[in-house]
Amino acid sequence: MAISASLVKQLRERTGSGMMECKKALVETDGDLDAAVELMRKKGLAKADKKSGRIAAEGIIAAKRSEDGHSGVLVEINSETDFVAKSDDFLAFADGVARLALEEKPEDLEALMACELNGQDLATATKELVAKIGENIQVRRFVRYGSSGNTVAQYLHGSRIGVMVELEGGDEQLARDVAMHVAASKPECVSEDDMPAEVIEKEKAILVEQARESGKPEEIIEKMVQGRLKKFINEQTLVGQPFVKDPDQTVGELLKGAGAKVARFVRYEVGEGKEKKEENFAEEVMAQARGS
């Protein structure tokens, strides 16, 4: 039977697929639009499964926070290209995933993928987006903070870096300032108490060996090591770092002056720890550095 251009257009609007694919599906289903949608869906999902093996190291960090400011989420959602990560379909999907993570309070990623988004579970919705966009899409990870009295603040830097801070005492502006600092300075933990003992001992052993090469007496070496170890700890901990907006004081001093304490923080960066083409990554980092 003859397939009208209007019918092809309707199928394209419903599936987001190409013109020739839509026309072929309509021919196979004798012009039955609903049957063609189902056929396209089946074929699309099959293609999506094949695409799921591709590296998805681009994407965005999405954030949502409750109206009372006591809970929030960060979610990393990956795509294969930055172009797709900026598309309306991808951004709407990411916003929906973040909303689910905040409202449904899933315990882990598996539970999140079972939550309902637009009438279907998130796992199926993800596959359908893969079929529509033509790239591997992955909901990689999420974190949720929630408390009855503490302030939760978030900071997003260009959608590629996301930070969430839970603050005891202080106010929302302070919490946001601390979140911005974490985005820029990348502390490993809040304070020395949170640093694994083996990390400190390993660094101390390295510093001792370096100091002994100076040939100085042991008591001098001990002082050298203690000074350098303190510097190392300050560089790694949030409270020991100079505050980015006022380097004359540390974050710890800033918090103390406000009668506040950071209960916890998390920092996400798109694609960290994932395989990525080296030349593209280097160019992107340089471009970000020039633009910041």
Curated annotation (Swiss-Prot):
Main location, first listed in the record: cytoplasm
Locations listed in the record: Cytoplasm
Gene Ontology cellular-component terms listed: cytoplasm
Positions of region (Involved in Mg(2+) ion dislocation from EF-Tu): 81-84
Matching SUPFAM superfamilies: Elongation factor Ts (EF-Ts), dimerisation domain, UBA-like
Entries under Gene3D superfamilies matching the protein: 1.10.286.20, DNA helicase RuvA subunit, C-terminal domain, Elongation factor Ts, dimerisation domain
HAMAP family for this protein: EF_Ts
Known role: Associates with the EF-Tu.GDP complex and induces the exchange of GDP to GTP. It remains bound to the aminoacyl-tRNA.EF-Tu.GTP complex up to the GTP hydrolysis stage on the ribosome.
Protein name in the entry: Elongation factor Ts
Organism: Alkalilimnicola ehrlichii (strain ATCC BAA-1101 / DSM 17681 / MLHE-1)
